[in-house]
Structure formats: C-alpha cells, structure tokens
C-alpha cells in the first residue's frame, strides 16, 4: 500500500500549505510546470518524487524530467505527462502512449482545473490535480491524495 500525493503547476511554489497537505504521503508525483530544477530538488528532499516537465520548465528541468513518465506502483500501470487532454479529447501524443502502454491511471496537468474522471474507452482513471502553485487564472490551489493498494485506488481527496 502506498499513499500518493499528486500535484501539478507549482510554478515555483512549494510552501507550508503544500507540505502540510503532503506530509503523510509516501511519494509525490508532479505532472509538470515545476518551475525550476531547484524546486524539484526541494520537493524530492521532502518526499520521493516522480515528475515530468511542463511547458514552462526550462532546459535543465527538461533534461532531468521527461515529457512522459510510465511506471508501475503497487501493480498499477501509471502514465504521467503535463499536456495530455481529457477522455475523448486526448492530444495525439498522449493518445498514442495510452494505446501503447494501457495504463490504469493517467495523470496530466496544464489546465489548472482539478478533474478526476473515469475513461471507459481506455478503462483508466484520469486525474488532473489542478494547480498547486500561486500563478495562473485559478482561484483555488489544488492537489490530490490517494491510496494505491494493489489494483485498488481509493481514499482520493
């Protein structure tokens, strides 16, 4: 069993509010627009970090963090990217990766809008954690926590 914190669009922000929300997770997964390699290092020193780069991330961050990251957690196949779209409207690169890798959990950021939806076409859970940072049009900063226990994804908040 692992407790996962999912964030995106921090744009250079990782403050006490986020630390408090994420203090009990086992890992943090960041869906891009980190803000800097230094901020990624700060997050990684707080909790183990898996991350992808986003459209505002510079060259150094892009060299360390890929556009797409595929991995398994507790037997659940995960695919994460920054700009992925939504069910029935995935961007072409994300759709190709989903079709090739068959993830059960697809995570994307970019929109700054928190949205969790089941995709019946690809039989996956799509999670966009919204924006955890202070910059952008969003009015409320958001992040997601969930438990992955075998094939069971639960206790999402």
Predicted feature descriptions by range:
Residues 1-49, 57-75, 139-142:
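N-terminal active-site segment of His-dependent metallophosphoesterases
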Residues 2, 73-74, 101-102, 127-157:
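Binuclear metal-dependent phosphoesterase catalytic core
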Residues 6-8, 27-33, 50-55, 79-82, ...:
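Active-site neighborhood of phospho(di)ester-bond hydrolases with catalytic His/Asp-centered motifs
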Residues 12-16, 34-39, 56-61, 85-90, ...:
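Active-site environment of divalent metal-dependent phosphoester hydrolases
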Residues 21, 72, 98, 117-119, ...:
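Solvent-exposed alpha-helices and their adjacent loops that cap or buttress functional pockets
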Residues 43-45, 98-101, 121:
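Short, conserved loop/helix-junction motifs that constitute active-site signature segments
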Residues 57-102, 134-135:
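Active-site-proximal segments of metal-dependent phosphoesterases and phosphodiesterases across multiple
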Residues 69-70, 115-118, 142-146:
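Short beta-strand scaffold segments in enzyme catalytic cores
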């Amino acid at each position: 069993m692992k407790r996962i914190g999912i964030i995106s669009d921090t744009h250079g922000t990782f403050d006490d509010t986020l630390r408090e929300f994420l203090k009990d997770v086992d890992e943090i997964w960041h869906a891009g627009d980190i803000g800097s390699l230094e901020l990624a290092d700060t997050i990684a020193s707080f909790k183990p970090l898996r991350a992808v780069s986003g459209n505002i991330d510079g060259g150094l961050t892009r060299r360390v963090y890929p556009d797409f990251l595929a991995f398994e957690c507790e037997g659940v196949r995960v695919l994460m990217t920054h700009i992925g779209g939504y069910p029935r409207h995935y961007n072409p690169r994300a759709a190709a990766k989903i079709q090739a890798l068959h993830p059960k959990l697809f995570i994307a950021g970019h929109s700054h809008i928190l949205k969790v939806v089941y995709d019946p076409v690809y039989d996956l859970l799509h999670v966009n954690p919204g924006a955890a940072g202070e910059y952008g049009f969003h009015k409320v900063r958001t992040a997601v926590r969930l438990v992955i226990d075998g094939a069971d994804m639960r206790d999402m908040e």
